[in-house]
């Protein structure tokens, strides 16, 4: 009797093995039929939930997963959230650029003389040495250019800066 049971289990296992690997998805789904109508919360009748094995065989598995995802999570809310996130990201970027530009204009106005204070106006007209005058204006110019490059890098622009160090190289700020 145990040999008959073993033989029956072996045949059943072989049949199940080949039936699982014979379909594209691995399993054949039976058609489900609902004998009674099903209603939703508002009293509207729901369509019958019948699996069509031909449709499942044609579709790829990710599309079935997408259908299940859209069943549980309506697409309207997902797109609204995505659009809100994109708007917030763009809005934050625009605010950052505006604040950087505002800061740049305030610095440039202060240096050029638009927003000068009493200390800037009382600057002596002549210095003892011409080298001192050149050095002072050159160092001021270098500070202004450093501020411009920094703010340009913050705003997303890149300035190329060439320098010589054992040959010619291109460096970015």
Curated annotation (Swiss-Prot):
Listed Gene3D superfamilies: 6.10.250.590
Region forming the signal peptide: 1-22
One GO term (biological process): adenylate cyclase-activating G protein-coupled receptor signaling pathway
Broad class of where this protein is predominantly found: secreted
Residue(s) carrying Lysine amide: 166
A cellular-component GO term for this protein: perikaryon
Proregion residues excised on maturation: 23-80, 170-173
Keywords carried by this UniProt record: Amidation, Cleavage on pair of basic residues, Hormone, Secreted, Signal
InterPro entries per the UniProt record, alphabetical: Glucagon_GIP_secretin_VIP, VIP/GHRH-like
Compartments where found: Secreted
Any one GO molecular function term: peptide hormone receptor binding
Function summary: Primary role of GHRH is to release GH from the pituitary. PACAP plays pivotal roles as a neurotransmitter and/or a neuromodulator.
Family of this protein: Belongs to the glucagon family.
Protein name as catalogued: Glucagon family neuropeptides
Upper taxonomic lineage: Eukaryota, Metazoa, Chordata, Craniata, Vertebrata
